[in-house]
Structure formats: C-alpha cells, structure tokens
Amino acid sequence: MAHNYLLEIGLEEIPAHVVTPSIKQLVQKVTAFLKENRLTYDSIDHFSTPRRLAIRINGLGDQQPDIEEDAKGPARKIAQDADGNWTKAAIGFTRGQGLTVDDITFKTIKGTDYVYVHKLIKGKMTKEILTGLKEVVESINFPTMMKWANFDFKYVRPIRWLVSILDEEVLPFSILDVTAGRRTEGHRFLGEAVELANAEEYEAKLHDQFVIVDADERKQLISNQIKAIAESNRWNVTPNPGLLEEVNNLVEWPTAFNGGFDEKYLAIPEEVLITSMRDHQRFFFVRDQAGKLLPNFISVRNGNEEFIENVVRGNEKVLTARLEDAAFFYEEDQKHDINYYVDRLKKVSFHDKIGSMYEKLQRVNSIAKVIGNTLNLNQTELDDIDRATMIYKFDLVTGMVGEFSELQGVMGEKYAQLNGENQAVAQAIREHYMPNSAEGDLPESVTGAVVALADKFDNIFSFFSAGMIPSGSNDPYALRRHAYGIVRILNSRDWQLDLNQFKSQVKTELAENGTAFGVDVDQNFDQVLNFFNDRIKQLLDHQKISHDIVETVLTGNNHDVTEIIEAAQVLADAKASSTFKDDIEALTRVQRIATKNEESGELNVDPQLFNNASEGELFDQIIKIEAANNLTMSQLFAKLCELTPAISKYFDATMVMDKDENIKRNRLNMMSRLANLILKIGDLTNVLVK
C-alpha cells in the first residue's frame, strides 16, 4: 500500500533570501535520507513560506525491502584453535550478527581463509524509519543561526511547531521543547491554528487559513496581480526576477496594490528613484508606454484587501520620506565641484595597512598608463583614462552615495556629466566597478575597461603586498571576483597583457611617479600568478575545457591571460584532428629531452657543430618561428605541428646526448629553444592522447 508523509517545520519569520535555498537543502537531505534507508517513493513535494519549510513524500512503501548479505569475520586461524574448536572471536562475531557458529562458512581471499555468515536483514517499517527525519531537520545549515530561550541549539529562527503525519497517523519526535503533531499555524494575522487529518489536505487546509504554501503558485499569483494592475493603468512593468523571488518569500497571502509619489521627485536621477523603490522598499517601479519612469509603484502586502488604502498611504509616506532625503542630497552635492570631493578622499582610508583613497587614485592612474601604453591606445583614449583615474572615486564622499551606497559609480557618472566631464570619462566612473559579480556585465567602453582593470589590479597588488591574501573561503575584499573580472575583461576584448612584464612595468611607473605609497608589486607576486591561474581555470572550466588541457596551458611559460585562454581553445579544437596524437608525441619528445639541459643562460646554437642535414633543417624552421611577430596561439600551434616530420627525421638521425660535450650542449640548446616555443602553448606532457 502506498503512503504519504508530511513534514513541516514551523518557524518565526525567516529572512527572505534564506527561504529558497533552505527548502532546496531540505529536499536534498530528505532525498539522501530515503536513499540511505532504502525507502522507495514516487515523488517529493516541497512547500515554503516565510514561516514554514515543508515536504510531502508521496508513494512510500510499507517497509524497507529485505536484503541478504554475506558478513566477513576473522581469519580461520583466529576463529578456530588447533583442534578445530570455535574460539571466542568466532562466537562473538556470529552473536553480533544475530547468528550462531553453525551458520559459519569459509571463503579464501588471497590465500587466507576467512569466516563468513550469510544473513537475511528484514526491512524495518517505514513509520519506524521516518522518525529519524528529526536528525535531518536539525542538520540543515543556514547562513546565519541563532539561539533562543535557554537552549544551546542553533537554527535560522526559533522552531515554534512541527508537523509529522504518515497518512492519518502522527509520527512524533521532539526538537527541544517542541513535539511534532498534526497542528499547524495559519496566517499570523488572518488565520488560526488548524489540525490536519492527513498529509493530503495540507494545502487546502492552510489555504482556508490564508496561507498559500506552494511557493511557485504564490509567485505566479503575485505576477498575475502585478500584470492586472499594470494593464488597468496602461503601465509597463517588468518585474525584476530577484525582487519577485524576494517578495514571494516575504508573504504567505499576497495582495498587490499600487501607490504613487509627487512628480517633483522625477527630477532626481532615475537610478536613485529605482533604488529607493526596488532595493529599499521592495516596490516594483513602472513606466509609461514610451518607457518613461512614472511617479507610481506596485507593491505586495502580506494579507488581504481589507484596509488596503491604509497600507497604500503608509507605503507612500515611507517612500516620500526617502525621496525627500534623496532630493536634499542631490541638491547639496551639486554645490561643490569634483576637485572638492577628490581632495576629501585624502581623509578617506582605503585600508589602514595600505593608505588613503586619494593615494589609491594616484596609484591607479600610474597602473592605467601602463595598460594604455601596452595596448597601444590612441591619445584621446589615453587622455580620457588619465582624467578618469584622477577622479573616479570622488562620489564616495558625496551625500547621495553616503545615503545610497548601491549608487557608487552611478552617481559619479551623473555628477561628472553635470560638471562638464566628457562622456567617456563619466561612463568610465560608472563602469570601473564592472563586472560586479562573477558573470556580471562587462564595461562597454575602452576607457571604462581600462579603468576597471587598473582599479582591480591595484586591489590585488595592494592587498597581496600587505600580506592579506585570500585563503579557503575567506576573501573579505572580494579579490577573487576582482581577478576573475580582469580575466573576463582581457579575454572579451582580446587584449594581450603578460602579467610578468606588466608587473615590472607597473613597478617602474610607480617608482618614477612616486605613486607606490608603500605598495610593493614584487611582494608575493608568485602567489599573484597562482591566484590568476586559479581564475583562468575557473573561466576554462565554465567553458567546458577538459582538465588535462587546462593543466597543460597553466603549466607553460606564458603569462598572457588572453593567450593562455586562446591556447586552451586551440588544443581543445585540435584534439579532433587525425594528426593530433603524432603531433603531441613529437613535441613532447622535444620537451622531455630539453629537461636534460643544464644551461640557464643564453641558449646559443652553432650550426657549425651540426653533423647531419636534419639538424639544420629543423633549426632553420625554429628560427623562422622565433622571428615571426605577433603570432596568435592558433598560428603558433599550427607552425609547431608542421615541425612533426622534421622532428621525427631529426631524432632518427641524431643522438642528442652525444659523447662530445660541445655537440651535446649545442643539441640540447636547440631542443630547449624549441621547447620554449612549445611552452608558450603549454606543457604538452599533460595532454591526454588516445
């Protein structure tokens, strides 16, 4: 007979951002529990609101299936004495298995006889096992935990009730002072407690108490209500998915409504209005048919339509107060020019071990010059970058950003435009924060991309120089995100930047300009390179590049981020080639013999010491590749693969490790020069070939 089991954890209000990951975790843990305990079932339904996490397991069997197994015991020489009598070890083993020595058989494993018993394990009843879900409930992890009353137990919020019903039967267990039963709670204000007769009536009974437990159903209802309000007012609304998810996890009985604010506040930059509505008040902003922002909003209350007009007025009042503050700051900020705010950055600490925000601007300006010159940007672009990096953090000390920190960069762009800065400079001030998440949008402008790179490089150089290097999950200054942003920006624009050369150029520029302010870019630079390799690996993993190729390109001698990524794609594409195996084997043969070279200086090769034609033929081709300028990784790999016949011919005719020391050194130097070209692609000995 199939059974249905309901488990509900009743809590005080959970933070909205915790609800969805928590119910997912509960489902995962319950699924693992059922598998571990060999319980068969048809499906698992999940339910979540701000006050409850619940699952219903459908189609459970009566009990675990019986299983048979052979249990291994001690070796025969331990289980029996010299006369063949059973020892205490044998008797104790069989007793522990619920059997007797009469059930013993022997199996030989690697020449040794061992005691075995065959036993039947009867399956436990389902209801007996399900009470073990108590441990599952207690094991859920949350980003923030709390204690309550006098208990040492920690949970996301205090547990106020538990429901545990198998069909119509309560399966009781207790957590702290709460014992599971069939009583659940309705809406905090509109509903009341209700007892469930069985697991199947869960949704209906709570719906009667103004709780929609199905999160997907609740979200769809909210979307429909927003759409209806928008259509009736001829508004355009595109609900932000993140906000919709958050609002959904704030309510149990959603009722959407609309309100408005004075049109005078439309003089404030749109981003400020949207931030006030969306991020601070959880409102959905609206536009007219032409896309213009309107002085209206849509919000969702946790309740019904009763006294909805009071709710509207209350929300309008709160929003108006916030917009009044914004209008004040917007007006006050414009009383000073950009230089005033830049000067104030001298008193703002970037970090107490590194220096002020003003010093950071000077350092970033120097770093940006190196980037701009390396990329051969035109003078207009270089001038824009120079100006942008001298002011790009000024908005941090404005009143608006002090009140609305989410608008840093955005307000910098607005105020820069108002102060007559050109669009490239203004846009770069906003874009230097990009990407602001692992897969966030990248800067659209060249100036913005360079300023973003310089700012992020400075963060990494500064904190690594001060010894504040991320470890494990600890990354308080988001340096991993900054490094990954650098990798993505360089790769997206196909900008070549050798990290070794770049570091040396930055060191020189900082020294010449006197803008290092204690930051030593040489300090922990090996760890900086490893740090970037990890971020390149992250990007290549995201692109589904195989592990062996990732390892190959990261263990070469190339420190150009874009070229490393290109090399990985070149190798991934080349794997399908019919000649790939032969090419890799030829090139790795060169690499392996080159490791025997003890020369560390200039790798001179004297053609006068060649003893056969194959040496000269191969060397001529090596010189041509070395002389080729600006080869892409695709072109370089193609030229290396073209050497396969010459390499094979060379090794057929040449003994590299010649008895004559001069000839041997000459040949090893030639192999090392070719190996160095190969290592620009990567260490091909890591490539798996079939």
From Swiss-Prot:
InterPro entries: DALR_anticod-bd, Gly-tRNA-synth_bsu, Gly-tRNA-synth_heterodimer
Subcellular localization, as worded in the UniProt entry: Cytoplasm
Enzyme Commission number, as recorded: 6.1.1.14
Domain of life: Bacteria
GO MF entries: arginine-tRNA ligase activity; ATP binding; glycine-tRNA ligase activity
Gene designation: glyS
Record keywords: Aminoacyl-tRNA synthetase, ATP-binding, Cytoplasm, Ligase, Nucleotide-binding, Protein biosynthesis
UniProt name for this protein: Glycine--tRNA ligase beta subunit
Organism expressing this protein natively: Pediococcus pentosaceus (strain ATCC 25745 / CCUG 21536 / LMG 10740 / 183-1w)
PANTHER family, alphabetized: GLYCINE--TRNA LIGASE, CHLOROPLASTIC_MITOCHONDRIAL 2, GLYCYL-TRNA SYNTHETASE
Family affiliation: Belongs to the class-II aminoacyl-tRNA synthetase family.
Quaternary structure, from the entry: Tetramer of two alpha and two beta subunits.
Single GO cellular component term: cytosol
Major place of residence: cytoplasm
Pfam family, one: DALR_1
Biological processes annotated in GO: arginyl-tRNA aminoacylation; glycyl-tRNA aminoacylation
Keyword Ligase in record: yes
Catalytic activity from the UniProt record: tRNA(Gly) + glycine + ATP = glycyl-tRNA(Gly) + AMP + diphosphate
